[in-house]
Amino acid sequence: MSRRKQGNPQHLSQRELITPEADHVEAAILEEDEGLEIEEPSGLGLMVGGPDPDLLTCGQCQMNFPLGDILVFIEHKRKQCGGSLGACYDKALDKDSPPPSSRSELRKVSEPVEIGIQVTPDEDDHLLSPTKGICPKQENIAGPCRPAQLPAVAPIAASSHPHSSVITSPLRALGALPPCLPLPCCSARPVSGDGTQGEGQTEAPFGCQCQLSGKDEPSSYICTTCKQPFNSAWFLLQHAQNTHGFRIYLEPGPASSSLTPRLTIPPPLGPEAVAQSPLMNFLGDSNPFNLLRMTGPILRDHPGFGEGRLPGTPPLFSPPPRHHLDPHRLSAEEMGLVAQHPSAFDRVMRLNPMAIDSPAMDFSRRLRELAGNSSTPPPVSPGRGNPMHRLLNPFQPSPKSPFLSTPPLPPMPPGGTPPPQPPAKSKSCEFCGKTFKFQSNLIVHRRSHTGEKPYKCQLCDHACSQASKLKRHMKTHMHKAGSLAGRSDDGLSAASSPEPGTSELAGEGLKAADGDFRHHESDPSLGHEPEEEDEEEEEEEEELLLENESRPESSFSMDSELSRNRENGGGGVPGVPGAGGGAAKALADEKALVLGKVMENVGLGALPQYGELLADKQKRGAFLKRAAGGGDAGDDDDAGGCGDAGAGGAVNGRGGGFAPGTEPFPGLFPRKPAPLPSPGLNSAAKRIKVEKDLELPPAALIPSENVYSQWLVGYAASRHFMKDPFLGFTDARQSPFATSSEHSSENGSLRFSTPPGDLLDGGLSGRSGTASGGSTPHLGGPGPGRPSSKEGRRSDTCEYCGKVFKNCSNLTVHRRSHTGERPYKCELCNYACAQSSKLTRHMKTHGQIGKEVYRCDICQMPFSVYSTLEKHMKKWHGEHLLTNDVKIEQAERS
């Protein structure tokens, strides 16, 4: 302490508790104070045996004592623990200087608390280490205040006298400390007052505004965070730790011995030395910031500027857990303090620097890695994403995905080497927190968030995020190619030579796409092996027979042969006679009118997309005239009969084609169907409506020209050689859905894949009967002109969900679950279903032969099960249940 301040020492708390037996020692201390020189410690040491063997170093305040003055050292320890800092604070006072407080005001102490504070005289300025604390400037004292360092407090046992004035908690003694302790909860700044000399009023630490009035203890403490008053410093400390989450002291318990503040290596001396915060030892090991070491601005200002350096900190720290935290697993909220509260975070980052013995303990390097996208912290919770990951790892396309990083290190034991890293059992998504067992599944799942679609089709603009989806998409191209293969009348194969540039183009594209897919995912399921022709022919005939037996006759049978003739002609097959130009144009206009009427009668006219397509078709007549080639034979039958236009040029046993422009829309109801008088055909009409509704996507998805050209060829190919009069798609090659469009499972939209020129120029030319003819080139490999495997030959795909079916009838029923269509209706009630078997099962509820029949009294509807009748009454006649007759019947029963 400077000579100017020796006459007016700083105000100290009067809770100085000294036993009477130590009075003679106190006198000896005052006599020896004049010649005692206090040396500035160069570092931290133990309780005994400091850096110099001839010196005694206090383990709490790092004050050195000559070995000959051991009594002074003992009394220094006793007086500090009693709450009086006079022996430590004014060790260099002159003999004539009055003590800071009279002994009559001191109280008796029965158990010591080790607290010390160091003040160095002016003669030892050259030995000073960097500033270790900020002491507020007092009003009535001239000159700056000497910086002092507050020591760490060792935990002590509770007193056996609960009602005595013994301090039983380490931090309760802080009420006796001078107001120079910079803690996060308050700032040490002077408070103006009108006291006499030596009684300057100063704000007390720990977030309290102490009203010092010259007494031994302030009368009230006010928390600067919540403005709650306290009449005791101990209550304020408890409030700060329990309410605001500050780790100030260690609560007594069995684990207290392992959580004592540890001794650290001394800070380096010099102008660039780091200012060590006095708070470092008051925060336990469990504080997350004690495990960090971050470079930041150091307090190198004059101690007098400490008023604005440590502002009052709001409650930004949540109560940390009471166990050792792994610095590698710091949450995003803790790391986010760097950006949100830089000053507070920098202040706390200076707590208790640790010796870096291994690269794993270099936390500053770890933080730089976190900021440099080299590691991904785990998500805060499975239900939400990690905001820190989005801050540090913004998505950007790169050769290596930023998500493919090493997993975080496991928690390390407090005193051991890092354990070997066990294999992670689950992977979690950084966006939604969903966990996966395999990394590959997590990578595919991330693409749903990022929109990345690395797998692209070479035949169209389809792209997907998974190789299996590309494989499924490629099957639709194979179905398109396979659907172009025809079928003869007798169901057997009839070889024909294709036009150059028809199937070869699509075959080459499929080969390239197949090779690209095999590059992405080596899956042998796309390989096609040839099968026996006899087996294929038998299966085709059996399948054809089953379809013919399972489908009812309909009035559209008159169109099947005619449509085949037109589709054959539309393919541009050479040798087909054509009609005259004028007759073809008139016939085209007539067919356009018939098409509009058919769409209105069937119900397609009510849908806006079909109306737009029809209007657009009329505008693009020139394109359709160029697309349709060949002649028209046997097209004079406009009545509703079963007109079989089998005469004309024979292609695969069919009639000839039609002239250009005579078929504006082949395949879509070439002639107006006859009315459906019988109720048995109602279901057939419904089924046709369902399929027609699903054939065309919304017009806004793709260009209308592409819609028309591909829909035209796809639907014509689907109905090319059907023997079943009622849209009998016997396999996937004849389905209008598998040939005209494919479902994109990525965005839920319908896309048309095949370019119009490939199919319109010659896509329908020269196809054989059952596609088993050896002359038809195989698309993507040798063999027949369609996928040779049983699954690929019979499978068909739903356009809505992508589900694959082996039977087209199952696909038709499945589509109704998406569209809500229920064509099968009960004639006795208003029950409707999408499957005939369900209607049959429903009809059993109306009565069976040989069983008792229950009839509804209101509508006379029969039921074979009484519970069904009760349900019917409640659902349809609930308002009639409580009629007078029912009430009378209920009264009789009661």
Swiss-Prot record:
InterPro entries according to UniProt: Dev/Hematopoietic_TF, Znf-C2H2_CTCF, Znf_C2H2_sf, Znf_C2H2_type
Tissue localization of expression: Highly expressed in brain and in malignant T-cell lines derived from patients with adult T-cell leukemia/lymphoma.
**Keyword Nucleotide-binding assigned:** no
Instruction: Supply the name of the protein.
Output: B-cell lymphoma/leukemia 11B
- PROSITE patterns on file: ZINC_FINGER_C2H2_1, ZINC_FINGER_C2H2_2
* SUPFAM superfamilies assigned to the protein according to its UniProt record, in alphabetical order: beta-beta-alpha zinc fingers (SSF57667)
Modification type Omega-N-methylarginine: residues: 293
Cellular-component GO terms for this entry: neuron projection; nucleus; SWI/SNF complex
Q: Where in the cell is it found?
A: Nucleus
**GO terms for biological process, alphabetical:** alpha-beta T cell differentiation; commitment of neuronal cell to specific neuron type in forebrain; epithelial cell morphogenesis; hematopoietic stem cell migration; keratinocyte development; lymphoid lineage cell migration into thymus; negative regulation of cell population proliferation; negative regulation of thymocyte apoptotic process
**Modification Phosphothreonine occurs at:** 120, 260, 376, 406, 417, 754
**Which GO-annotated molecular functions does the record name?**
DNA-binding transcription activator activity, RNA polymerase II-specific; DNA-binding transcription factor activity; RNA polymerase II cis-regulatory region sequence-specific DNA binding; sequence-specific double-stranded DNA binding; zinc ion binding
Domain of life, source organism: Eukaryota
Q: Where is this region: Disordered?
A: 370-428, 471-583, 653-680, 737-794
